[in-house]
């Protein structure tokens, strides 16, 4: 079933066109990776889905509803959570309190139920339970990434947008983060991610889209992308930039 369908998506900033008629589909239960060089439009795609890009055109349909042009708050309520690059946690709040902020759109849910769900998030992510009362300024980069993803999941999204979840992390921590991404899909959440590490991204993704200068270059299963000589040479030889 198509959960997200993008047709002819355009986005423009002052410097010019960032997205130039992008088509993209995400089926329910998938992990889909957006790959490509720096400035290709990957992060802008996630921001456009989330209602964070003002000058957009085309069509973005989520669960059969047109969402392009809606406010971010309305998009979150429909079931889309966006974990941006840089994590953007509140350093003066504890791990637990940062996670609970992810449920700010669920005002009708009782506090006791939200606390129970926060407990589930703390148990789901390695190491977070013992850190629940620690302030986020004291965490490592990997721990902060886990908190950011847990906060996104507190919104109970059908679609989780992850923008460069491995940014600035050591290789062993990156592997841990992507094991969590696989587990997130296994618990029923669809994932669309932007990633600079093609090896790791395609190890968990069902399909990938390679963008170039704001347009789709090629898409396919990981094995299809790896077997494409042009794509492999240009973008998948380690994919040093995003």
Model-predicted regions and their roles:
Residues 14, 70, 95-116, 124-126, ...:
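ABC-type ATPase nucleotide-binding domains, specifically the catalytic core motifs of the NBD
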